Design a protein with these regions (language model features):
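A ligand-binding cleft/hinge motif common to bilobed small-molecule-binding domains
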Residues: 98-102, 221, 226-247, 298
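Short, low-complexity disordered leader/linker segments with a strong preference
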Residues: 1-38
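A bilobed periplasmic-binding-protein/Venus flytrap-type ligand-binding module shared by bacterial periplasmic
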Residues: 142-147, 261-274, 293
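Short, polar/charged alpha-helical segment
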Residues: 35, 40-65, 81, 141, ...
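Extracytoplasmic ligand-binding site segments that recognize negatively charged/polar headgroups
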Residues: 43-51, 71-74, 87-225, 257
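Periplasmic-binding protein-like
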Residues: 167-174, 284-305
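An extracytoplasmic/periplasmic, membrane-proximal ligand-sensing/linker region
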Residues: 192-197, 302-329
C-alpha cells in the first residue's frame, strides 16, 4: 500500500472522519501538430477545483477527449502503482508534492521539463523533471464572525488546542493531502514529538474531522462550528456564498512557526498511452492562461511569476512564511 511516514502519526490518532534510473529530461519543444485523441487524468484535487482548467484545455484543444478520475491522493497513488506495468492514466494531478515525490521514487513518472518551467521557481520542480508544482495554498484559520469576535479568534494553529474551543473546530481528516502535507512540514520544522503532540491535542479538543475542506467551510459558514482549519481559498469560496466568515493567516509572531504553505502539482505517467497529450496538459497548467484560471476562479496562488493574483487574495509577501524543503517533507 502507498503510505507516507506521517500516516503512522495521523492514523494512529484516529483523526480521519470517514526507482529505476530516470533518463535525462529535455525541455519540451512546441508541438508541430495540435493535440488530439484521448487524455486520462487522475486527480487528487476535487472535481470542482480541477474541472475549470480542464474545460479551458478542451476549448483550446477540441480534438482531445478528456476522461477525469477524481479521488484521494493515496487512493489514486495506490492505483498508479498497481497499474505501473499497464498504465491507465496519462497524467496525475496531486494536492501536495509528497505524493508526487514518492511516486517519482517508485518510477511512476516520465521526465518532462515543460518550456513553461522557466517561469516557475526551482523550489517547486523535480530536478529531473519528474513532477512540477502548480499552485500554492496557505493553511489558514477561518471563523464565523457571528460566533467569534476578531480579538478572540485563534492567532496560531497551536491555539486550536485551547480548551475554550473544545468541540467547536472543524478540519479535514487524515485522508486529506493538505493536512498530510501540513503535518509533514511541521515534523520537518518542529520535530516528530511536537508535531505529534499537536495532533494529539487536536484530538483531545474534540476537533471534528470531515472528509474534505468543502464540508469544513460550509459547516463554519452555517455556524455549525465556530472555527475551521482550511486552505486559504476555501475561505474565499465561502465568502463568495455571502457567509459571515473571516480569516486568520496564523503564526505571524516573531518566535512563532510562520505561515505553512504547500503546493499542488502534477506528473506525466511513464508509459502513458497518450503521452504527448499528457505533456500538453501539463504545459497548459503551467501556461499563463492555465495559471490565471487557478488564480481567478479558485483563489489560489499561481506559481508563475507573471500570473495575476485574484484581487481579493492577500499576497504571500504580506506574511512570514515557514521555510522548509518541499521534497524532503
Amino acid at each position: 500500500m502507498f503510505k507516507k511516514k506521517l500516516f503512522s502519526i495521523i492514523l494512529t490518532l484516529a483523526l480521519t472522519a470517514c526507482a529505476s534510473a530516470t533518463p535525462p529530461p529535455t525541455v519540451a519543444p512546441a508541438s508541430a501538430a495540435a493535440p488530439s485523441g484521448n487524455l486520462v487524468i487522475y486527480s487528487g484535487r476535487s472535481e470542482a477545483l480541477i474541472k475549470p482548467v480542464i474545460e479551458k484545455f478542451k476549448a483550446k484543444y477540441p480534438a482531445v477527449t478528456v476522461a477525469l478520475k477524481a479521488g484521494s491522493n493515496s487512493e489514486l497513488a495506490n492505483a498508479l502503482i498497481e497499474e505501473k506495468t499497464n498504465p491507465q492514466a496519462d497524467v496525475f494531478v496531486a494536492t501536495e508534492l509528497m505524493t508526487l515525490q514518492s511516486l517519482a521514487d517508485r518510477g511512476v513518472f516520465e521526465a518532462h521539463k515543460s518550456a513553461n518551467l522557466k517561469d516557475v521557481s526551482s523550489q517547486y520542480q523535480h530536478p529531473d523533471g519528474l513532477w512540477t508544482g502548480l499552485t500554492l495554498r496557505a493553511r489558514v484559520i477561518m471563523y464565523n464572525t457571528d460566533l467569534v469576535k476578531a480579538d478572540d479568534a485563534p492567532k496560531s494553529i497551536f491555539d486550536l488546542a485551547n480548551p475554550k474551543w473544545k468541540g467547536q473546530i472543524a478540519a479535514a481528516g487524515s485522508a486529506n493531502g493538505s493536512l498530510q502535507a501540513q503535518v509533514a512540514e511541521m515534523r520537518q520544522l518542529l520535530g516528530d514529538e511536537k508535531a505529534q503532540k499537536w495532533l494529539t491535542d487536536l484530538k483531545a479538543n474534540d476537533v471534528k474531522f470531515f472528509g474534505g475542506h468543502t464540508d469544513v467551510r460550509k459547516a463554519v459558514g452555517a455556524g455549525e462550528f465556530k472555527i475551521g482549519l482550511v486552505n486559504h481559498y476555501y475561505y474565499h469560496l465561502q465568502v463568495a456564498e455571502k457567509s459571515k466568515v473571516a480569516v486568520i493567516y496564523p503564526d505571524q509572531g516573531k518566535e512563532e512557526l510562520g505561515l505553512i504553505v504547500n503546493a499542488t502539482g502534477a506528473g506525466v505517467i511513464k508509459g502513458a498511452k497518450n503521452l504527448n497529450n499528457a505533456k500538453a496538459f501539463v504545459d497548459y497548467l503551467l501556461s499563463a492562461e492555465g495559471q490565471e484560471i487557478f488564480a481567478q476562479l479558485n483563489y489560489e496562488y499561481p506559481l508563475r511569476k507573471d500570473a495575476p493574483l485574484h484581487k481579493d487574495v492577500a499576497p504571500l509577501t504580506n506574511y512570514r512564511i515557514a521555510v522548509f524543503d518541499v521534497v524532503k517533507v
